[in-house]
Amino acid sequence: KPGRGTAEAKGDHGKIDVLTGTLGKAIGGAAGGYISGKKDLISYMRQKARTYIFSNSLPAPIVYGASAAFDLLMKDKSLVKKLHKNTAYFRKEIVKLGFTILEGDHPIVPVMLGEAAVAQDMSKELLKAGVYIKGLWFPVVPKGEARLRAQISAALSRKDINRALKAFEKVGKKMNVI
């Protein structure tokens, strides 16, 4: 997979009128997002889309950082390969530890915990162990489907991932999750 999103993965680039993307995860992890499409459509959206009209421009450092990240991804194909390798490794190892994850190969790995209180507590305990990970619960996800959202990156070394996995194991056992 080249890592250029769903449209490319599905071979749908020529069939899509509006392409949206986030800058809050893969590209720099800062904030914001983008839409792209034909000039007339984008011009219309700038005049009519309330979310655009009543919002602020992204700060210049975020735009510059995202642009630099896109340039880097275009030049260095090894980053996408490393991301896929890191993702596959984390997914395989977290399941070996006894955690349940949603299937897939996406670098955002939902570690399913069920109850909101468990996700909240585990997120706090992992932070104490040096791993920052967001918990999600109702109303963000359906009731009973609370989870931790692990975001795997090409910037992580195998040592980083193993350290996170050890923290998951320690906290998971302490909380009787695994």
Cite the ranges covered by each PLM segment.
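Active-site C-terminal subdomain of aminotransferase-like
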Residues: 1-105, 117
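Membrane-embedded alpha-helical bundles of multi-pass transporters/translocases
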Residues: 4-6, 129, 133
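Alpha-helix N-cap and loop-to-helix initiation/capping positions
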Residues: 11, 114, 156-159
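Short, solvent-exposed amphipathic alpha-helical segments in soluble enzyme
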Residues: 36-38, 51, 125-128, 167
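Hydrophobic side chains in well-ordered alpha-helices
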Residues: 44-45, 122, 164
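Conserved PLP-binding catalytic core of the aspartate aminotransferase-like
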Residues: 81-90, 95-130, 140, 144-145, ...
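PLP-dependent enzyme catalytic core of the Aspartate aminotransferase-like
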Residues: 128-131, 140-178
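Beta-hairpin "wing" of winged helix-turn-helix
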Residues: 135-137
